[in-house]
Amino acid sequence: MIPVTSFAGQSVAVFGLGGSGLASCHALRAGGAEVIACDDNLDRMVEAAQANFITADLRNLPWMNFAALVLTPGVPLTHPTPHWSVLKAREAGVEVIGDVELFCRERRLHAPNAPFVAITGTNGKSTTTALIAHLMRQAGYDTQMGGNIGTAILSLEPPRAGRVHVIEMSSYQIDLTPSLDPSVGILLNVTEDHIDRHGTIEHYAAVKERLVAGVQDGGTAIIGVDDGFGRDAADRLERAGKRVVRISVKQPLASGITADRETIVQADGGASHEVAKLDGIGSLRGLHNAQNAAAAAAAALALGVGPDVLQNGLRSFPGLAHRMEQVGRQGTTLFVNDSKGTNADATAKALSSFGEIFWIAGGKPKTGGIDSLAEYFPRIRKAYLIGEAAQEFAATLEGRVPYEISVTLDNAVPAAARDAASSGLPEPVVLLSPACASFDQFRNFEIRGTKFRDLVTALDGVKPVA
């Protein structure tokens, strides 16, 4: 745990008592603050009370007594409308911050030079975060990984010299971290997502850019320049005097890091050299994973990792569950769990990685549908549509891709397995990459992916992927 000493002797309101919120309560109390905990969920209030925290309805308390409101990232800060706790704090002139802001303040107080890598992007940030942490561990560093990827940041060990914190950050977390100052900041990409929480794509992109704009003096901003938002951000930061490393999987760069499906190449002033090989690494299959690997390599190099350690680390990376996860084979059919493909851009990366696809898609639809995936339709032998988006997706596929309305995963998996097995293709792929959120049928994408994995492993003759 990281004790938060910056509010010692002061009263702090914490709203949202899930994993990160409760961790904030413990960290603040350990640092000497008085914590008043609140949540709209009464069960979480009971849990906090059982942990001996003061709980109260913050609507009934005088806000001038609070030094800060620590807000969980899941609570609306601006859109579609600010949560009532945010309005109360603003009326009283109380700052509204999140757990990563508490971490940043503690790092500046106690270990300002401790390496801190922060990663964001619409897609790929979890894989990139896990890969960087893996590379740093392979290089012998004491590595702490958390944030949006799982472990609450304040539940990690405190910053100190020689200890690296590798932290995934969502746009919600960045919004709550006004003094974000990583030593290495990574912006992978920006495509339309979470517009319900940010209002416009421009505001969403501006929030993402703040992560790299905040890189501390002497640090490195690593920016994917394969979209216009990234290109503009890189140019702005360079003009502001930041050290910028551009990464691309679409074009060779005169200065920066370029990757394709086989190699990572670093260029400087026109001269280039190979940094690492990617061919044959199953956990990093696909051009989207080449981008993740390029960003991770750039971060590792910025932190002093040598080329041999980098190459060995890439080859030994096990990958992440629900992200292009190869869950089994039945004869020649490969089953791939990409449940984390919650929007069309993420699913495009999965579809581009295989040739003969029996595609399971659908769920709670997002803005834009799957029209942008048309270039990949020739790769799809048949689609199996589930959830709320089934009819919408069927209308898009009509006349272009054979499909059936499967409604549920329970129906889709055996149907896709049957059709793949009878197709006569040399390596058919049954791919779950929904291009949708999961909330119509599952609590989250992890539960959806686990359900897919369970259904696959229950099929006759399915074996683990060697």
Curated annotation (Swiss-Prot):
Disulfide bonds: none
Binding annotation for ATP: 121-127
Gene Ontology cellular component annotations, sorted alphabetically: cytoplasm
Pathway participation: Cell wall biogenesis; peptidoglycan biosynthesis
Keywords annotated in UniProt: ATP-binding, Cell cycle, Cell division, Cell shape, Cell wall biogenesis/degradation, Cytoplasm, Ligase, Nucleotide-binding, Peptidoglycan synthesis
UniProt keyword DNA repair present: no
GO biological process: cell division; cell wall organization; peptidoglycan biosynthetic process; regulation of cell shape
EC number(s) recorded for this UniProt protein: 6.3.2.9
Reactions the enzyme catalyzes: UDP-N-acetyl-alpha-D-muramoyl-L-alanine + D-glutamate + ATP = UDP-N-acetyl-alpha-D-muramoyl-L-alanyl-D-glutamate + ADP + phosphate + H(+)
Cell location: Cytoplasm
NCBIfam families assigned to the protein according to its UniProt record, in alphabetical order: murD
PANTHER family per UniProt: UDP-N-ACETYLMURAMOYLALANINE--D-GLUTAMATE LIGASE
Family that this chain belongs to: Belongs to the MurCDEF family.
Role played: Cell wall formation. Catalyzes the addition of glutamate to the nucleotide precursor UDP-N-acetylmuramoyl-L-alanine (UMA).
Identification of the protein by name: UDP-N-acetylmuramoylalanine--D-glutamate ligase
Protein's organism: Rhodopseudomonas palustris (strain HaA2)
